[in-house]
């Protein structure tokens, strides 16, 4: 597929949004555990991807689909940040993230937009086995990271 100059520019914009996740710190570790240098959203996402890849293969789920969902699950935070549940209502968080996600995905080639929005909505709805698996991976990664911070002396 040959991309037009504007499509290439849009992809660069999309990838910059992805890379921005490296700069966004996971706020829960700062506010609840006083971690001085917490993991970034990108750190969290990478750990989740590795855990999701291995565990979905072990229990024979659709690993490719789960990997896409895992990669997309926190992408909107590049625009809206890592909001704490006590700072913003769940409904407001979903609205903000949905608006951000639509804007982010609009930079992708048209044949990917609907596919990725469907996966994002599946994750938000949390009604499929894949979505429940990814939500559980969020919790597992957080528990493992908490243990790491505990080893470092945080409580």
Predicted region positions:
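Active-site helical microenvironments for divalent-metal-assisted chemistry
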Residues: 1-155
């Amino acid at each position: 597929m040959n991309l037009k100059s504007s499509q290439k520019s849009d992809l660069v914009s999309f990838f910059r949004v992805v890379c921005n996740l490296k700069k966004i710190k996971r706020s829960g570790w700062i506010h609840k555990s006083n971690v001085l240098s917490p993991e970034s959203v990108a750190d969290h996402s990478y750990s989740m991807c590795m855990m999701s890849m291995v565990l979905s293969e072990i229990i024979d789920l659709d690993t490719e689909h789960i990997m896409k969902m895992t990669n997309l699950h926190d992408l909107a935070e590049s625009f809206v940040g890592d909001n704490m549940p006590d700072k913003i209502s769940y409904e407001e968080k979903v609205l903000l993230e949905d608006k951000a996600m639509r804007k982010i995905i609009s930079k992708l080639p048209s044949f990917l937009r609907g596919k990725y929005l469907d996966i994002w909505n599946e994750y938000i709805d949390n009604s499929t086995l894949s979505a429940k698996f990814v939500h559980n991976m969020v919790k597992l990664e957080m528990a493992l990271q908490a243990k790491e911070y505990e080893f470092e002396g945080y409580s």
